[in-house]
């Protein structure tokens, strides 16, 4: 009976946290994309703007991917586990949004959300942004697992992963013959799908490189770099 009650309480806190995260996203979105603040706080109608729908639901999917891999430690009781889970979930959420903002600042610095999504309804831009958000979630999921509930290790690996992902986005123009900025402005889906496949492939490679015990950070960082260099050799 006690075990059943604990599961019910955990599920209640999980649902509550998920709802709070979805509500908080509206305000966090306005914080990161200041020109769109007034439109974000209004009611959302998916059928009115397909680009905005892709942009939003890719981020929701990213949150789901990360939350799906969070673990709950019941060693100190149900209430401490629930409190720890909520704190961890909130931290993960804001790290995720911050990561998206940083990576978009590197790859999409020539574009503005309000101009491309709200005004032009640029589906190519929304697709690139959405697939990039999912790629960030894939990498962060591996980071949180490698950190093993250690904040110190998390805040060492997190910037390291962003640097790797940022370098990856900058290298796209060297491995692709397509004009990224020009084709995004024209709304060409070819560049969106090409970049999406590229960033997803690299996100899986980077995530796989972090799947190891991170107790010795110097050896761990060297091991990650070695894995990535080996991946470059076999990556087409």
Where would I find each of the regions flagged by the language model?
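Membrane-interface helix-loop-helix junctions at boundaries between adjacent transmembrane segments
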Residues: 76-91, 99-129, 145-153
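Membrane-interface segments at loop-to-transmembrane junctions
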Residues: 40-55, 113-128, 180-195
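Membrane-interface helix termini and inter-helical loops of multi-pass transporters
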Residues: 72-80, 143-152, 180-181, 210-221
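Hydrophobic alpha-helical transmembrane segments in multi-pass integral membrane proteins
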Residues: 65-68, 131-142, 195-212
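Alpha-helical transmembrane segments
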Residues: 3-21, 80-97, 148-165, 219-234
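Membrane-interface helix-loop junction between the first two transmembrane segments
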Residues: 23-47, 176
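Alpha-helical transmembrane segments and their immediate juxtamembrane interface regions
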Residues: 89-112, 164-186, 230-236
């Amino acid at each position: 009976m006690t075990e059943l009650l604990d599961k019910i309480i955990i599920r209640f806190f999980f649902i509550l946290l998920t709802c709070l995260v979805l509500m908080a996203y509206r305000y966090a979105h306005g914080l990161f994309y200041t020109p769109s603040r007034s439109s974000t706080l209004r009611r959302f109608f998916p059928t009115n703007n397909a680009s905005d729908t892709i942009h939003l639901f890719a981020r929701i999917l990213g949150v789901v991917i990360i939350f799906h891999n969070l673990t709950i430690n019941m060693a100190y009781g149900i209430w401490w586990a629930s409190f720890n889970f909520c704190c961890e979930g909130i931290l993960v959420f804001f790290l995720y949004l911050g990561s998206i903002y940083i990576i978009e600042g590197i790859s999409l610095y020539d574009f503005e959300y309000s101009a491309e999504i709200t005004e032009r309804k640029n589906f190519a831009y929304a697709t690139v942004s959405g697939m990039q958000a999912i790629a960030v979630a894939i990498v962060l999921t591996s980071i949180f697992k490698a950190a093993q509930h250690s904040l110190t290790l998390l805040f060492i690996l997190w910037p390291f992963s962003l640097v790797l992902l940022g370098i990856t986005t900058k290298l796209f123009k060297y491995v692709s013959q397509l004009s990224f900025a020009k084709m995004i402005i024209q709304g060409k889906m070819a560049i969106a799908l090409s970049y999406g496949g590229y960033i997803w492939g690299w996100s899986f490679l980077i995530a796989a490189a972090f799947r190891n015990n991170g107790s010795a950070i110097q050896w761990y960082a060297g091991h990650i770099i070695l894995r990535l260099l080996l991946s470059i050799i076999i990556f087409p």
